Amino acid sequence: KLDELESLLLDVVDGIFQNQAELDAYPHLSQAGVGDLRFVDTNDDGLLNGDDRTNIGSPIPTFLYGINLGLDFKGFDFSVDFQGQTGNKIYNAKETVRPDLYNFEQHVFNRWKGEGSSEVEPRATAGGYNFQPSTRFIQDGSFFRLRNVTLGYTLPTGMSDRIKMTSARLYVRGTNVFTLTDFTGYSPEVASNSSIENGIDNSTYPVSSIYSVGLNLTF
């Protein structure tokens, strides 16, 4: 739930109910069972409701950056372009519509199977309680990407003159070569059609990696 454009307001997950005694001793919603997520009663009133939701961070990056480098040497030219961002949170909403029962995500293999088996992934269920909005689906949106890299070679003037051209340049180029991120969605550059859904990833289409070879000829 978005409280303001700058904040994500969610229930806070604090592990998994490992046994019935633990479930009985802690505030929980009526549909919770052993192996389900344990939510924090942040105001200590003995109830779990909207008053327990907590501002867990902003979907807006605190820092955006880019790095551009270029080098020319004896006919060779090299350029590289990096970009990145840090300081933002992403709500990975695509995982809320892929219940563990269908094994769409690999983390289902680490699910709770019995007491002590997991403190992170709840038992497999077909949606419901464990998929309500919470910090379970919050991830760091920071990333570092090699956006473009190009290596080219321009023929010496004497050689291009002999083939009756002003210049000839051969190059190879890579676009979106790699992205370093802890985000498990398709792309940390989350797109939204609504300003109130900023930072909510509903399966943003991933950026494509493109590799090309080209030849620039000037007559």
Where are these regions (language model features)?
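Acidic, glycine-anchored loop motifs typical of Ca2+
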Residues: G15, G33, D41-D52
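Outer-envelope beta-barrel architecture signal
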Residues: F63, K74-F76, S142, K164-A168, ...
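Outer-membrane beta-barrel "beta-signal"
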Residues: Y153, V207-F219
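Flexible, surface-exposed loop regions and adjacent strand-edge segments
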Residues: E95-F104, D182-S195
